[in-house]
Swiss-Prot record:
Protein name: Ribonuclease Z
Cofactors demanded by this protein: Zn(2+)
Pfam family, one: Lactamase_B
Catalytic reaction(s) noted: Endonucleolytic cleavage of RNA, removing extra 3' nucleotides from tRNA precursor, generating 3' termini of tRNAs. A 3'-hydroxy group is left at the tRNA terminus and a 5'-phosphoryl group is left at the trailer molecule
Species, as recorded: Haloferax volcanii (strain ATCC 29605 / DSM 3757 / JCM 8879 / NBRC 14742 / NCIMB 2012 / VKM B-1768 / DS2)
EC number, as in UniProt: 3.1.26.11
Comment on pH dependence: Optimum pH is 5.5.
Amino acid sequence: MSMRATFLGTGGAVPTTARAPSAFLVNRDGERLLFDCGEGTQRQMMRYGTGFGVSHLFVTHLHGDHILGIPGLIQTLDFNDRDDSLAIHGPPGSKGHLEQLVHAGGYQPGFHVSVHEVRPGNVAYRADDYEVRAFDTEHRTASVGYALVEDDRPGRFDREKAEELGVPVGPAFGRLHAGEDVELEDGTVVRSEQVVGDPRPGRTVVYTGDTRPLNSTVEVACDADLLVHDATFTDEEAERAKQTAHSTAREAARVARDADVRRFALTHISARYAADPSPLLEQAREVYDGEAFVAEDGQKLEVPYADSDGGGAETGE
């Protein structure tokens, strides 16, 4: 099952010519989940070819660079004759403000939009085989991060063992792999556990939004396939990071290291690094020795299963 992440906006509070405000989209086998919606997000979606079929929008907090794209997105979806509903999720206390954005200027969308508040530790959205969980973050206003966590997958099916046990090739293989026991014509029962290995973990993608480095992020991001973490400043602005409740690249890298994530994306890059963001990555790599990169607008990333190959970062343009 495919999973592709697209960085639509990787800038800080002040956009630059190269970086739009925060927006991050995950396409999981055709279902599109949007995390934050800064100004111009709908144009970024057009520019980078993600499509508009977003089913859920997960808002981390109510600062403008994370939400002011909502009115434009809603109206663009409506003008494109959208029929499907859209669910918007936000931190405690956000519902009224988010509803105002949906109806900015008295606008009444022609499709259903629902707004929900989610508390840290709760599930914002549950699908058949994955869920999106909210977790604690620390910013200057009510905020949450989100973790997309897939269910475990069935273990590997041992076809050779099944044939040795007399299981005929065909539908019985699928039933065994799905966890059912199978009775053969001679009355012998072949148990699923005899031919199926241990469950294999699904994928986890963690998106923090704006935050200080926290143990709660380490816990939820443990062994994650991708961590997208606030890395607004370099060490030289560490005091400012504390004052504004952001993270430095080094602090974010410590979270990535302690959580032992497979890949780590630095985002929410301050405009002061517009000419050269390389110091952020250099400082992060002094702490975290895994695959780390400064996310760029339009960058696309395949998120493979941990037991498969491939999945490196791509550039969108």
